[in-house]
């Protein structure tokens, strides 16, 4: 009986090891017990190898734990290695275009003041009765970014239906693979499609700006509305809509820009937003003679301003998408950590059940031999 008690203790001890434990128990046969000769004293004995064998469920849990931990490593890497640097690049791109926008705003303001109350012909500032609207919708090219794409698509679809309900015709200019795929499948009228990727360029913005201005100036649309995701913070974004053309002179000269800056402290990312002052109108002396008519200069500046606004919007949308992806990867990592803890508890319970079952079998075997 002593040998079986030793075996039982070994089985209990093996429950606290990380791997299944094998041990050898030398037990006396019935004849040896009857004669009072034990295995330690006789060469006639048999060996029984006892191993705590995990059942299929426990093995499946162990494999799942490994899979969850590997997934968590991937999501953390996507957040730290891929998303964060791209947000910084988008931030730097916005800051780099700011001087150009400020100069255009300043020159435009100065020319408007120089023209004073004159009746001027500025086609991109001319308002007319709205019978048809073109929606410029900016979405992302990829998924794994939470509700970034779905929120923008829902807002665009709601605005389209609102215009139709009010008797206003509407069509779409789409930027981004996700929006293109969604609206194409549902048969929406699409005027033009663009894919700008994660690093929008001035050339891509120029192509979109030319399409927008030609659509408005040709009279095919009476207004173009811009729908994009405004970058608020790393954990929040705001689907926004505003009229892109016709421009309002007061909006151009009276609104300052907001810039964002990605910060990090104690391993945590954050965003600082700064509202910039309006660029002061450039002063042109009354005796200054322009080689070209000021109206022609303004008409030349407005397309450049439109191009700059679209480029800035594309860059801000990319920053919003990347921030949403960072947050999505952080949530996925947190969920993976919680799931791994839960699975570890289940695995330990399964191991405990296997140890208990093995112990009961040993004790039952000992009782049967007595």
Curated annotation (Swiss-Prot):
InterPro entries: ATP_synth_F1_ATPase_gsu (IPR035968), ATP_synth_F1_gsu (IPR000131), ATP_synth_F1_gsu_CS (IPR023632). This is ATP synthase gamma chain, chloroplastic. GO terms for cellular component: chloroplast thylakoid membrane; proton-transporting ATP synthase complex. Keywords: ATP synthesis, CF(1), Chloroplast, Hydrogen ion transport, Ion transport, Membrane, Plastid, Thylakoid, Transit peptide, Transport. The gene is ATPC. It comes from Phaeodactylum tricornutum (Diatom). It is found in: Plastid, Chloroplast thylakoid membrane. Produces ATP from ADP in the presence of a proton gradient across the membrane. The gamma chain is believed to be important in regulating ATPase activity and the flow of protons through the CF(0) complex. The keyword Chaperone does not apply. It is a peripheral membrane protein. GO terms for molecular function: proton-transporting ATP synthase activity, rotational mechanism. Residues 1-54 form a transit peptide.
């Amino acid at each position: 009986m002593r040998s079986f008690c030793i075996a039982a203790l070994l089985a209990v001890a093996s429950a606290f090891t990380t791997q299944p434990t094998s041990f050898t128990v030398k037990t006396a046969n019935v004849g040896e017990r009857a004669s009072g000769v034990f295995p330690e004293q006789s060469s006639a004995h048999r060996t029984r190898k006892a191993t705590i064998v995990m059942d299929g469920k426990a093995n499946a849990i162990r494999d799942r734990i490994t899979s969850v931990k590997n997934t968590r490593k991937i999501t953390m890497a996507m957040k730290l290695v891929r998303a964060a640097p791209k947000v910084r690049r988008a931030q730097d791109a916005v800051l780099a275009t700011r001087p150009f926008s400020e100069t255009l705003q300043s020159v435009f303001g100065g020319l408007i003041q120089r023209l004073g109350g004159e009746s001027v012909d500025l086609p991109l500032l001319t308002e007319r009765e709205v019978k048809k609207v073109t929606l410029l919708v900016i979405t992302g090219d990829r998924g794994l970014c939470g509700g970034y794409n779905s929120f923008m698509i829902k807002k665009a679809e709601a605005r389209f239906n609102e215009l139709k309900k009010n008797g206003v015709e509407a069509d779409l200019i789409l930027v981004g693979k996700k929006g293109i795929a969604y609206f194409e499948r549902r048969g929406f009228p699409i005027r033009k499609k663009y894919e700008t990727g994660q690093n929008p360029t001035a050339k891509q913005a120029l192509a979109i700006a030319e399409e927008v201005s030609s659509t408005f100036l040709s009279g095919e649309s009476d207004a173009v509305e811009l729908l994009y995701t405004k970058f608020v913070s790393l954990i929040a974004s705001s689907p926004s809509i505003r009229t892109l053309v016709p421009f309002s002179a007061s909006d151009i000269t009276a609104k300052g820009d907001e810039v964002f800056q990605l910060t990090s402290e104690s391993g945590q990312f954050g965003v600082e937003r700064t509202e910039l002052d309006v660029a002061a109108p450039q002063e042109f002396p009354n005796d200054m003679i322009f080689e070209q008519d000021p109206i022609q200069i303004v008409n030349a500046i407005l397309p450049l301003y439109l191009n700059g606004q679209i480029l800035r919007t594309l860059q801000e949308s990319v920053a919003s998408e990347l921030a949403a992806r960072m947050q999505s990867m952080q949530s996925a990592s947190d969920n993976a950590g919680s799931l791994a803890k839960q699975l570890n508890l289940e695995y330990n319970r399964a191991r405990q059940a296997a140890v208990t079952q093995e112990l009961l079998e040993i004790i039952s075997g000992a009782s049967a031999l007595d």
